[in-house]
Structures are given as C-alpha cells and as structure tokens.
Amino acid sequence: MSFPYSRISKSENETTTIAEEFSKYLKPGMIVVLNGDLGTGKTFFTKQVLKKFGVTNSNSPTFAIVNPYSGDEVFYHFDFYRINKEAELHDIGIEDYFKDEESIIIVEWGNLFPQVIPHKRIEINISFSNENEREFSFKEYE
C-alpha cells in the first residue's frame, strides 16, 4: 500500500478487506487518525484492524477516551468525540501515548483536536459517497 490511497467500500465485507490490507502496513510507533461523520464506520474499521492483530474484544472508547488492547501488538484506541477541552487530553497524558514507540495508536475524531496530533501520522478520512458506499482516503504525513 502506498499513499495517498483511496478505496470505495460498498459493504461491511469490503470495509473488512480494506482494513485487513491496511493492517499489513502497521507497525509499532505508528499513529493512525480516523476522521469522518457519525456512522461512516470509523469504529468498525478499527475493530477489523484490531482483529487482524488478534484482538477480539474491542469496543468504542467514546466514554473511556482510551482503550488499551494487547494482541500481536499493543494498541491504544482513542476517541476524541466527547472531549470538550484539549486539557482533558493532556490530563490523561496524551503526549506520553504518542511517544510510545512500542505500541500502535489509533485515534477516532482526531480532527476535533488537530493541535495535539503529531505531524507524523497516517490519516484516514471516511466519507459517504452515496447512501450505501463509503470512500476511504489514506494519506501519510512524515
């Protein structure tokens, strides 16, 4: 997979395939940011990525802010949707998570607090291309 990269998904099965392809690229120290409207499939995509690494008990961290997972790799899955102030992210030590070279960080709704996201990241924007299709746009920032 090389970036930028775009794919259209017409079903959950196709989204799973896209997530599995993307999973092959991931390694410790990477930060992945998923942006998109409610219902575009950010959490579903993340769950499929985690499954490829042996994590089967994942759920959205909307209320917890961050969920840690251990499988073939260590993951920290963030959801910024319910965060009201940037200070809340600093209170949980967001900078320390981002510096962790031994884990993979996945952030949903990173566009809500772009100032805390490191420049080096992979950003995935998910949008509705029509009622039953999603467009996945991948871009890597160095």
Regions found by a protein language model. Give the residues of each.
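P-loop (Walker A) phosphate-binding loop of NTP-binding proteins
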Residues: 35-37
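Short beta-strand-centered segment that lines the nucleotide-binding/catalytic pocket of NTP-utilizing
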Residues: 55-70
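Short hydrophobic/aromatic beta-strand immediately N-terminal to the Walker A/P-loop
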Residues: 31-33
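Short phosphate-coordinating micro-motif centered on Lys-Gly-acidic
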Residues: 3-5, 85, 95-142
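N-terminal pre-Walker A segment at the start of P-loop NTPase domains
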Residues: 1-21
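Phosphate-binding P-loop
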Residues: 23-29
